[in-house]
Amino acid sequence: MSAGEPGAWGVDRLVLLAPIEPATTGNGLAMRAELFRCAAAVELDVETVVVPVAGRLVAADSSVTIVAVDAERARSGALALAADPAWSDRLALASPLPLPARLASPGLVDEVACAVDSSGTVAVHVVRAYMAPLGIALGERLGARWTTLDLDDDDAAFASAFGDLDAARAYERLLGVFGPEFHGLCAASADEAVSIGRRHRLAVDSLPNAVRVRGLPASRPVRAVSRETSLLFVSNLTYQPNVEAAEQLVGTILPALRDRLAGRVSVTLVGPHAGRLEHLRADDVEVTGFVPSLESFYASATVVVAPIRHGAGTRIKLLEAFAYGVPVVASSAAANGLEVVDGRHLLLADNCDEAVAAIEAILAEEGLAPRLIDEAGRLVRARYSFEVVAPAVRDFFARADARARSGQRATID
């Protein structure tokens, strides 16, 4: 590449705009942002800017630029944007925006743009739908060659399932207005990508979550028979569906197992919880908060249990358990979107009785745990490893560049 010539995908640098710092562990959204950051960094420099509407990590990366959420500056900036007829129309059609989109308001574009190196040719990748208005504003302000959006989940469908119809309609409006402005969109689930694409006539790629498997053993030694059963739940424990799952695990599943098993049964809850799980602490219940490394927790776990009843965000944690070689018992909601087969890669359980029976089966049935571990490990290496998914992310960016070159967006005629 000669001096002054753009690099990969027609740009010198990628600006990644996210609602949380990218990280290798601790939070599913942070891990997904890290996937895109690392995939792009193979080809060019990546500058990460975070407007932390999805929270802050304890062990934050000092190279990440944080732009604080400021309601007053956001309001004044939005008024300035509204003076532009195109933005006035966009905001009128999309309003009221979902709450996270109001916090990460497009009115913050001046502050975000000032935090970014504006030299050379740039592209902008945006993480989550609620960051889309700010992402489009930033792309226009920087003169970005192309912009992409990782939806991750179907926010409208999730809000509707949760009974929040106002939020569901807000996300539909947002994506209807801002989705067609992007050169590429993607989601973690193939089914959700298809559903979103059909509803909004958008070309939405499926890019699954991924975990690092390099350096991990191809299989975990079979644990010696023990009179202690250690149940592990790893997640963002500030997220309400995960809080409810932790409460069900400790309050319902744990007592039922104690009544049926002879040895000690314990639960370890790992992940940031902002004090919301203090009431669950007990002699046989450990609440760790954020930890920088999960290796020791997976090494000592008998079974990973994810009794999510609704919501999203646990799927990447199931992949992590697969990669570490721990048998998994999970609800259908927790495994939604993963190409898993009940009884082959994990055991599905959608209520307390099913969860208890599944855990008992893993403990009692000879060969079941090693078989689940082996099949899940094969799956994660073939479908959900960084080594497999990162090239697909780079192909996604290449398609966005190709659309930009031909004057197209990610829309379906």
Regions found by a protein language model. Name each.
Residues L346-D353, A361-G367:
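Conserved acidic donor-binding segment of nucleotide-sugar-dependent glycosyltransferases
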Residues S296-G313, Y324-P327:
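Acidic donor-binding loop of glycosyltransferase active sites
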Residues D191, N209-A210:
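Carbohydrate-associated surface elements
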Residues M1-D70, S118-S119:
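N-terminal subdomain of nucleotide-sugar transferases
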Residues L368-R383, V389-D395:
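A short, well-ordered alpha-helix in the C-terminal region of glycosyltransferases
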Residues R32-A33, V211-A299:
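Conserved catalytic-core segment of nucleotide-activated headgroup transferases in glycan assembly
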Residues K317-E320, P327-S331:
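Short hydrophobic beta-strand element within catalytic cores of glycosyltransferases
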Residues L35-C38, P106, D110-C114, D154-A156, ...:
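Membrane-proximal helix-turn-helix segments that form the acceptor-binding/catalytic region
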